[in-house]
Amino acid sequence: LVGSEMCIRDRTGVKSGDITVKTASNLDKQSQSVQDYVVNHINGTEHSSTKAKTTLVVAPVAEMPESDRQYGDYARHDITWNSDASDEDEQDYAQSAQRLVSALQLAQNEGMKVVLISNTLQGYAPDMYVPMTAAEQIGELQAKELVNKLELDKASSDAPKQIEVLLPYDAADGHDAKTDTSFAQNMFKGIWKVLEPYFKDGKAASPSETLTASTTKDDWRSVAFDSSKAEQIKSVLAERLDADKDDSHPVHLDGVISCNDYVAKNIADELDKLGYTGSSADINPSISISGIVDSITGKKDLKRQAVPDPAKTSSSDDDSDSDNKENAKWPIITGYGAYISSMPNIVNGKQWMTAMENRKALADDIAQTCVRLNTSGKLSKLGFIRSATVEGKKITTIHEETLAISADNLKKTLIEPGYISLADAGL
C-alpha cells in the first residue's frame, strides 16, 4: 500500500494531501478504521461528484497460523467467517469482518470505488480486485520449476529422480483444536497437480516413500509436519533420509520442495550437517559459483545444459565409496518469499529458486487504476487489466506474473529493480 501511495503521488501527480494512509494490525482495528473514514468522508462531503472521485484501496488483514506467515504478507488468504459460531473469538472475528464489508458497501453506495488487495471478503464484490499468489499457485510454481530443472520428462523408471516434499503447517494441539490447515492442503494440491504424473509413470520417487504412485491430492498429511521450530524442520528431513540410522551412507536426493524460504534455509543447514556437498549449480556443469557471481555482477551470461541422470546403484562393494559420493551431491531446493536472508543461499546455489510478487509493478498498476477510477473510470486500455469471478460476480482485476527467482536471473528480477542490493545478496 505504501508503494502504491508513492506511485500515486510521484507517477500520477496526485497531491500528498489528497492521499490518506491507514494501517492496522488486525481485522478488528482495520474494520473500525475503514468504517470511521467512510462515515466521516460521507458526512464531510456535500457533493456526490467529490465522493465519486474517492477510491479506497484496502488489503484486508487475515488472521492465519504461524506456518502460513512464513510465506510473507502477500500470499493470498481469503477471509471467511461463521456468523452463527458459538466460540467467542470466532464471533468477534465475524463481527469485525462484517463491519468491514458493511463499510465498503456503504462507500460504494455513496459513489466511492473500492480496490481490494490479495484477500477476498466472504460475500463481497469490490470494483477492482488485485489478486496475489494463492497457496495452490505457490505449490504449482515450485513443482514446475523443479520439473524443469530436473528435466523429469526425460527421466526413466530405471533411474527415477528422488524428490521429497516438506509441507509446513501448524499441528493442532489441546489449546487450539481449530487450527486452519487449508493453506497447507491447497499448497499440496498445487504441488501434486504437477508431480503426480511423474510418480505414476515411475519417473519420480520419494526416498522416504511418503509419496508414491497411489498418492492423491488429499494425502497432504503424508508430507506435512509442524514447522513451529527450526529444529523440527531439520529432524523431519533427517528422519526422511534415515540419517539417524546410518550417517555414513547418504540417501540420494535430487530435489526438495520446501514450500517457503524459512523451511528451505533449515533444509540447507541440515543437508550441510548431513554431509551433502556442492550446490544446485553443480547439476548444470556450465554454471559454476564464480559464473553465477560474474553473471550477477554483469560480467557474463549463464548458459544451461541438460541435467545429468543420477548414477544407478552399484552392487559392487568396490563402488560403495563412489556411490556414497554420488548420493551426497547437493539437491535442488525450492522455496517462496524471497527473504533477504535467503539471497546468499540463492547466489551460492544452496537454494535453487524462490518466488515473490512483482510488488513494484503492482504498486504502479494500482496507482494508475486509482487515478483512472477517480477521473474517466475507463480501464480497458491498461495492459495489466483482466477479469475474474469474485464472490460470484465478474470483477475487473489487475494481473502481474509472480516472479520466479534463481541465481541466473536474480540480477534482472531483484537487483536491477531495486528490491535488494548486491550486499543483500552477499556480494
Task: Name each region found by the language model.
Residues L1-I8:
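Short, small-residue-biased leader/transition segments that mark boundaries at the very start
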